[in-house]
């Protein structure tokens, strides 16, 4: 795959065109996750990943965000890893600006409503319990702790 890295407004941007595709994916990855968290901050990056989808200045509720994405046929989600958190939207090329604008609104102008903060705490706790019930996830955590116990990757 051919790709190109450009610096735009001080931000490293990776462009990987795939001519055969009928959609684009805009992925914004942020250097935020467990290896950067202090013990008293454990889990904050994961929690914020959930909260950023709750609304911004232009779309103030999760429903408004979902409706706006649906109007352009976009799929949006986020994922967290040891080194980064990624927020992404996949849509038709003609809606690229719309998708980027929506991600920017959620990430740069996020609004954290108190009722959403409380509700999302429960969602994140349930997600963590789900991982605890997964033998594969449990094995992965035990393996990381065993082999990487003395550094941030062992968290």
Enumerate the predicted regions with their spans.
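N- or domain-start disorder-to-order transition segments that initiate the globular core
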Residues: 1-23
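M16/MPP (pitrilysin/insulinase) zinc-metallopeptidase core fold and M16-derived inactive scaffolds
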Residues: 20, 27-90, 133
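Hydrophobic face of alpha-helices
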Residues: 45, 62, 66, 100, ...
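Sec/Tat-exported extracytoplasmic proteins
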Residues: 52-56, 107, 111, 128, ...
